[in-house]
């Protein structure tokens, strides 16, 4: 998303101004300020006021069909944007209603340029979205995770057949502002799988951190000391896993000196069927993700 010319402007409309949307807006403004123009909606007037205070230079609308959101010209550098990405950042149950609003907008105002519609909802398929949105819509399903809040997210994406290479690139650039790892997935079901792995994985990590901290405290460490040691250890291990080209099993083996305390700890996890429990948890999550689109 270069910023050298007005033709490179990307327009972003956020339907919903919740936590994920705010994280992405913050990242976009910091990373691409001169080459992105952003509008955002919210349902409640109080939320609209909060967003307007937080983002005084952005267009903030109550509801999804306001003329100021769709009928006002995109004005940054005085040119029509090269790409328009509409990000649907609402709860899954609200997605069909949002798409109905978008159909209304399309019939009354049209779109220039034709937008790419992006969702962040597991379970809701491109076929469903294509049925709800204007005919021939370009749709990208995505699954970011909560570390986008510190711009360290991981995001899986799946594009329908209508999405062009230019549209896919514009969407990837938007997520890259908050997500160093961007992965386009070839099979759509992979998005629901990614939601169960990368989407949920922060909770797995936080739970393990909490257990380790509690164990340290129970054996006499001060809570702040245990917390600092465990969190930094997790950060360091993640960085090592990213930078070291060897397998994860090799990295585990490095820590597990034969006959040592860590090896004994890993043996205890195996006795408790740790791997099987985690795999079963992933299955539960995956079943729930797939069911969302059927509710």
UniProtKB/Swiss-Prot annotation:
InterPro entries with a match to the protein in the record: 6-PGluconate_DH-like_C_sf (IPR008927), NAD(P)-bd_dom_sf (IPR036291), P5CR_dimer (IPR029036), Pyrroline-COOH_reductase (IPR000304)
Top-rank lineage group of the source organism: Eukaryota
Disruption phenotype: Decreases 100-fold the apicidin F production. Leads to the incorporation of proline instead of D-pipecolic acid resulting in the production of apicidin J.
Stated name of the protein: Delta-1-pyrroline-5-carboxylate reductase apf3
One GO MF term attached to the UniProt entry: pyrroline-5-carboxylate reductase activity
Encoding gene, per UniProt annotation: apf3
Function: Delta-1-pyrroline-5-carboxylate reductase; part of the gene cluster that mediates the biosynthesis of the cyclic tetrapeptide apicidin F (APF). The non-ribosomal peptide synthetase apf1 incorporates four different amino acids to produce apicidin F: L-phenylalanine, D-pipecolic acid (D-pip), N-methoxy-L-tryptophan and L-2-aminooctanedioic acid. L-Phenylalanine is the only proteinogenic amino acid directly used by apf1. The 3 other apf1 substrates are non-proteinogenic and have to be modified by other enzymes of the cluster.
Induction summary: Expression is positively regulated by the apicidin F cluster-specific transcription factor apf2 that binds to the eight-base-pair motif 5'-TGACGTGA-3' called the 'Api-box' that is found in all promoters of the apicidin F cluster except in the promoter region of apf2 itself.
Keyword Oxidoreductase appears in the UniProt entry: yes
Biological-process GO terms, alphabetical: L-proline biosynthetic process
Biotechnology remark: Apicidin F, like the other known apicidins, is a cyclic tetrapeptides with anti-malarial properties via histone deacetylase inhibitory activity.
UniProt keywords, alphabetically: Oxidoreductase
Record-listed E.C. numbers: 1.5.1.-
